[in-house]
Design a protein with these regions (language model features):
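Long, position-biased, composition-driven segments near the start of the mature protein
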Residues: 1-254
């Protein structure tokens, strides 16, 4: 999937030339300096936490609120107001006000990402954890306007062995789901609360002391950098793409 037709990405570079304004919404990640964009990371909050409020700056664009609304419009079905993840054993039982986004560049995944064949290691102050989807048999029980939907869990693809992929858990220690995977869109949506409950974080959380992400309203938090650092620290993002290629056969009788 990645540039050079490699299946594993181990170098994660951001660009100093990306505009400051766009960094309030997302961060492009490259395979090398002056390389190709591999994916973008973003943070969204339904009510705009993590961005400067209009009370503090009447020219604020409420970047985190706009990002949440953008992906809600792209991925959620009509009538769904929030992203939903596991709550204990109940699928979609937890409504999340905030989300992390990994949006793979279209030039990389082309038609769709290969469900069951991606993994990303996230590193934090606790330790490193590997995350995959729970597709297993390559089909999904859940299909929405954005196509197939799978849950994200900690686990292993067990590459190099005869074993199938294994899911260790779909939830954190408090019972909150890790995220969703939309292979037809090349998008992974993660639950920041569950992710940081598991991997931890040592990043300054600003005015919201003790939190995993900055939830204040006096400055632009650019919380997507927390996710970027977790991916960079993990040092391995594996993924494949898949395409349906149509062929036509003509039989000529002489």
């Amino acid at each position: 999937l990645w540039t050079g037709n490699t299946g594993s990405l181990s170098t994660f570079v951001t660009s100093s030339s990306q505009s400051a304004a766009s960094l309030n919404y997302y961060t492009n990640v490259y395979n090398e300096a002056a390389g190709d964009v591999q994916y973008a990371v973003a943070y969204g909050h339904k009510f705009g936490s993590g961005s400067v409020s209009l009370d503090n700056d009447d020219s604020s664009t409420l970047a985190s609120k706009a990002t949440y609304a953008q992906y809600k419009q792209l991925l959620l079905d009509q009538g769904d107001d929030k992203f939903k993840f596991y709550s204990g054993s109940t699928e979609d039982g937890h409504e999340s006000d905030d989300i992390y986004i990994i949006n793979v560049a279209r030039a990389r995944y082309k038609e769709k990402m290969d469900a069951g064949n991606w993994s990303v290691i996230l590193s934090g102050s606790n330790q490193t954890f590997n995350f995959i989807d729970n597709s297993g048999k390559k089909f999904s029980d859940s299909v929405g306007k954005a196509g197939r939907i799978f849950n994200v869990g900690s686990g292993s693809l067990n590459l190099g062995t005869e074993s199938e992929a294994t899911i260790s858990s779909l939830i954190d220690s408090n019972g909150r789901g890790y995220g969703k995977f939309y292979p037809d869109q090349g998008i992974i949506v993660l639950n920041p609360t569950a992710i940081h409950q598991t991997i931890g974080t040592s990043v300054d959380s600003g005015s919201n002391s003790g939190a995993s992400v900055y939830e204040g309203i006096t400055r632009e938090g650019q919380n997507q950098f927390l996710l970027h650092e977790a991916i960079r620290g993990g040092g391995d993002f594996q993924a494949r793409r898949t395409e349906n290629v149509s062929t036509s056969h003509y039989f000529i009788r002489a």
